[in-house]
Amino acid sequence: MPPTNRPPPFSTILSSASLPSYSSTDELTPIYQGAEAHLYKTTFLSPSQPAALKIRPSKPYRHPILDRRLTRARILQEARCLQKLVKEGVSVPALLGVDWEPSAGDGSSWLVMEWIEGEPVRVILEEWEAYLKGIEREKRLGLGEGVQGSEEEKVRGLMRRIGRAVGGLHRAGVIHGDLTTSNLMLRPLGSADTTETIEERDQSPSMAGEVVMIDFGLAMQSSQDEDRAVDLYVLERAFGSSHPRTERFFEEVLVGYRESYKGAVSALKRLEDVRMRGRKRSMIG
């Protein structure tokens, strides 16, 4: 990772080898490091205000002028999408700050966002599928009654909330570009305690909470049905590949989506065309 300046009000320089240690009031915790961006948990303005710091580093293999233009365009696109969605009342991280031309002059750019507490929907569904597998095993051994209807209804409720969240995104004229269950957070309502006791580890995970979409690095502004349908198709494929036991509930996502805004019907019709093209592509290889 190339040296990257920590933006104001941050002052510590990130080393290419490792991150230096910080005091309890000035902590920078690595969360994710990808090819396009690095994500950290930090604080903003106050030690009690957690925030997410996203840095888009420069690419040394690109021409410096082209690199600065691309990095600037992408960070500004992400910031504009977040700002628009917050204004429209969509559940996304609030934008706290952005700098597309830091004074370091190294070609990097950054933005600071609200820190979203909770778990990714991916983790919740993986825990539920593991719980489901255990229940089915007990039933085969004659030790239980199998999955209760309330469990399936709980999953259906979460799927519908996901659909409504995506519908709100599309109603606002924004396309996510990378809709997966890793980019959907389930934020606890109020001050709910998300810590888990030993007795609760083998229980069905809670699915209560607000669905919050994160990571808008590939987002764009569009009201085209084709773009909306592709967004939905990416999410559908994510369920098929990552959550095989939950895939059968994906129709509930579309139910919630259909209820969320007037233009949903035409986007769902286009989804059928996108699915058809996807199947042909899979057959051809």
UniProtKB/Swiss-Prot annotation:
- UniProt keyword terms in alphabetical order: Activator, ATP-binding, Chromosome, Cytoplasm, Hydrolase, Kinase, Nucleotide-binding, Nucleus, Phosphoprotein, Serine/threonine-protein kinase, Telomere, Transcription, Transcription regulation, Transferase, tRNA processing
Catalytic residues in the record:
178
Any one GO biological process: tRNA threonylcarbamoyladenosine metabolic process
Q: Which Pfam families would you find in this protein's record?
A: Kdo
What does the similarity note say?
Belongs to the protein kinase superfamily. BUD32 family.
The UniProt comment on domains reads: This protein is considered an atypical serine/threonine kinase, because it lacks the conventional structural elements necessary for the substrate recognition as well as a lysine residue that in all other serine/threonine kinases participates in the catalytic event. BUD32 has protein kinase activity in vitro, but in the context of the EKC/KEOPS complex, the catalytic subunit KAE1 switches the activity of BUD32 from kinase into ATPase.
What is this protein identified as? EKC/KEOPS complex subunit bud32
Name the species this protein comes from: Emericella nidulans (strain FGSC A4 / ATCC 38163 / CBS 112.46 / NRRL 194 / M139) (Aspergillus nidulans)
Gene name in the database record: bud32
